[in-house]
Amino acid sequence: ISTVAKALKQSGINSLLLSIDAFHREHISLDKVYLFAKAVSDECISGFKLHPAWVVKREEHNKYNEETEECLNYFVDLQIPITQGNNIFPSGNAAIYLSEFYEKKPINLSMKCGEAPYTERLDNVETIAINPNGDVVVCCFIIGNIYCDNIIDIVGQYNPCTNPMIGALINGGVRELIKLAEEYEITVDTTQFYSACDVCRNIVKRLSLRIT
């Protein structure tokens, strides 16, 4: 653990958010996370903060938020700053396992990437994610793999205009993506989803098998 913390310090990293919440505790014991947090804190890495995730919002009273508060208290002696955290929205597993906490509302299908929380325009990307298998991801689109190509090349070669799904989202939002899916005989029942993002991810997953 100390070796990893020192490596992070040497890399020049200037922002590090450590997920602390009820959901991560199900898979990783707080004792182990505490040791990592202390090691990073001892290295004085700038921008190191604890980053919780809240069901609906922090002020909402439910068992998951109560457990997350308990998790944060576990680290109180380290005096690590805490971010406001993320408000979980019902998409993916959250829509399956946390549906009781959310109400289905009419979905704005004209919504474009960058208008929903935690999203950005696909033609003005500032954030990427790298999955454990090396996939480089922009939102839910895989644009390369670091085990196959250099990350600089992957980012430099990203062109949203070459992907018809991205083009549809940029031009007309989720509604345009649905039209594209229908051209490939893919039907979408939007009443089964909680958000435009959830509709989008479902279509992209299914449509990618037809287009690529």
What residue spans do the PLM features occupy?
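Alpha-helix boundary/capping residues
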Residues: 40, 75-78, 157-161
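Flexible glycine/acidic-rich beta-alpha junction loops that bind and position SAM and/or redox cofactors
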Residues: 26-28, 54-109, 143-145
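Radical SAM/AdoMet-radical enzyme domain recognition
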Residues: 1-75
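Accessory C-terminal segments flanking Radical SAM cores
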Residues: 85-209
